[in-house]
Amino acid sequence: MSERKSDPDRDDSERAFFGRRKGHKLRQHQAELIDHLLPHLALDIAGEAPGNACEIFDPAASDVRLEIGFGGGEHLAAEAQNFATTGFIGCEPYVNGMAKILAQIEAGNIANIRLFAGDAAELLAWLPKASLSRIDLIHPDPWPKRRHWKRRFVQDRTIAAMARVLKVGGEFRFVCDIDDYCAWTLSHLARSADFKWLAERADDFRQPWDGYTMTRYGRKAAREGRKAAYLRFRRS
């Protein structure tokens, strides 16, 4: 798998950039999973997408969900095991994260996950219209410096891209412990006629939704006293 070195100050506004492509050196078995298991699960978006995203999976899924930037994969793996007839697409450009989800897929014999190691914006453009029931973005890179805000995933263009692929009634769910990025996300979604924030009272965004699997990063943030917001937006 090739790496692309990126200049964080370069204006690359068409790219939804998450962060580093590779971190710690992979252990031998992790490298073997990247070499031998990933090719069987990786989506190839060079060709035309299927007319129905459920057909990405074999057997065909009852519906399809996407997790963007799944990190260590704890949430993605748990959701796939809890909803066995749903197909899950995990998007993660960080090689170490990809190795971690592959290990969980192997250990749990999980058959309903497909993976994409590239740019989420390209994946969203490839997927059929109204093909997803849900998109999750959990603890994304907040890019705290003002000059890097253009690299945050939540932008007007990505909101429009998500609106295109979500079914009416589908949801975009966002979890973040950085207040500024939460406010950024709320303000950007408020500008879109395609989404409605579902919170009716404070606990609706202060507490995880039912069945939420806490990630390793989420537990670390809680230990350090950072409170996350759990935002849900319905495609209208």
From Swiss-Prot:
Residues 1-23 are annotated as: Disordered. GO terms for cellular component: tRNA methyltransferase complex. Gene3D superfamilies: Vaccinia Virus protein VP39. The keyword tRNA processing applies. Pathway: tRNA modification; N(7)-methylguanine-tRNA biosynthesis. Keywords: Methyltransferase, S-adenosyl-L-methionine, Transferase, tRNA processing. This is tRNA (guanine-N(7)-)-methyltransferase. It comes from Bradyrhizobium diazoefficiens (strain JCM 10833 / BCRC 13528 / IAM 13628 / NBRC 14792 / USDA 110). The gene is trmB.
